[in-house]
């Protein structure tokens, strides 16, 4: 398969942006439960800005493979049956929550609404981060299912397509998170680097499984 470069840029940039946000929220979640030192708001704000920039660049790349970009908004109207329509809806929702998450950290406005029995605070960034976490995985699923639901492309018509989107996007994002932590939050760099290695290995396993599966596919028809 040889997809257009715009599709490659779209999926790579947006997937990395999703993964970077997940890395940031992983650190904040660990810190909330006392498993890591509390990090500066600048770490989360700058990381969110980078994730948001990747999402914007991916969105820009998506317009290059649209025949009529000015009609792109209409694709959201088929959300009941189309994974592309669902992606068009979930992507801006995810971008919006990532933006608010980053701005909340940047402004230092983070009121606490309640506490869990463990003592972990339920604050504004925890709420926004949880919403963005849901949107991030929903977006991975929507993007993967755009290709995994195509029966005539047997190489993609498999749950492995969705799994690989999640793993490879997560590997890219956690690697970026580890690089950012090396500069702004050295205390959490080993955690993010470790997760990046684990997810990358799982991505290798998933991709290898896909290649093995595709190699065993038999054509349904021949020229003979």
What are these regions (language model features)?
Residues 1-54:
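N-terminal signal-anchor module of multipass membrane proteins
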């Amino acid at each position: 398969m040889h997809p257009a470069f715009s599709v490659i840029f779209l999926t790579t940039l947006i997937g990395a942006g999703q993964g970077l946000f997940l890395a940031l929220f992983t650190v904040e979640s660990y810190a909330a439960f006392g498993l890591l030192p509390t990090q500066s708001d600048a770490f989360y704000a700058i990381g969110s800005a980078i994730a948001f920039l990747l999402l914007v660049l991916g969105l820009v790349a998506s317009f290059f493979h649209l025949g009529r970009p000015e009609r792109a908004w209409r694709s959201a109207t088929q959300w009941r049956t189309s994974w592309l329509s669902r992606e068009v809806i979930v992507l801006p929702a995810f971008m919006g929550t990532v933006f608010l998450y980053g701005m909340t950290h940047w402004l230092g406005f983070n009121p606490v609404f309640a506490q869990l029995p463990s003592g972990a605070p339920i604050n504004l960034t925890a709420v926004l981060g949880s919403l963005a976490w849901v949107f991030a995985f929903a977006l991975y699923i929507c993007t993967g299912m755009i290709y995994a639901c195509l029966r005539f492309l047997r190489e993609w018509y498999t749950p492995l397509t969705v799994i690989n989107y999640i793993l490879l996007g997560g590997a890219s994002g956690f690697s970026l998170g580890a690089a950012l932590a090396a500069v702004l939050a050295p205390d959490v760099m080993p955690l993010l680097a470790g997760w990046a290695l684990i997810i990358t290995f799982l991505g290798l396993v998933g991709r290898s499984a896909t290649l093995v599966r595709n190699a065993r596919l038999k054509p349904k028809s021949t020229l003979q």
